Amino acid sequence: MKFQRLAALTCFVAAGILISSCDKETPRQEQKPAQPTTPVVQPEEPAAPGEARVAVAQPGGLEAALKGQDLEQLTKLTVRSGVLNQADLDYVTKSLKIEAIDLSTATLRLGDEDKGFYGNSTLKKITAPADIEKTQKDWFSNTLATEIIFPGNKLKSFGGAVYNEKLKSITLPNSVEEIGAAAFANSNFESITLSTSLKSIPT
């Protein structure tokens, strides 16, 4: 009899423990918020000796952007951002002695009657803005540049003549649809890259 009571008591206690353990919630693992992925930014290579890289705050602001630079030693200028106007290009032609200018990430704001780089006697390589859509008569004329590059695919009309016996190479993007008459007169090209979108080639 005592054994039966003891067995019953044991079963009751065991059942109580089981019920008690079922009532307890299993603790949840706290989920840590996902860490944001930080993009890897490649450090920019330092400017080479004689090179300046500037951002122009406003049209006509190139001279101010070059303040503090050793202009006598400057041979290459890269304008990383900003809008340049005719006053900026006049400053390049009249006050600087650079041999290369890279405007691929800048913007030119010139009127149809503006002269651009006309008459520049030191530039050997000109890289035009990637967003330029047209060129006019004198913008790249009568320079001593041996190479002119038009990056990007915005240029539709190459309307100006270069009139440059020194020019050996010019690269026009595939977006160009028309070339002005006598555009390459008085030039001695060794290499010319024309657009596949040209509707006609002037003679």
Residue ranges, per PLM feature:
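Short, low-complexity, disordered segments immediately C-terminal to signal peptides
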Residues: 26-42
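Consensus positions within tandem repeat domains that build extended binding/scaffold surfaces
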Residues: 116, 136-139, 159-161, 180-183, ...
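Short acidic, Gly/Pro-enriched loop/turn segments at secondary-structure junctions
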Residues: 85-89
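The feature captures the LRR N-terminal capping module
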Residues: 41-70
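Leucine-rich repeat
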Residues: 65-70, 90-94, 115-119, 139
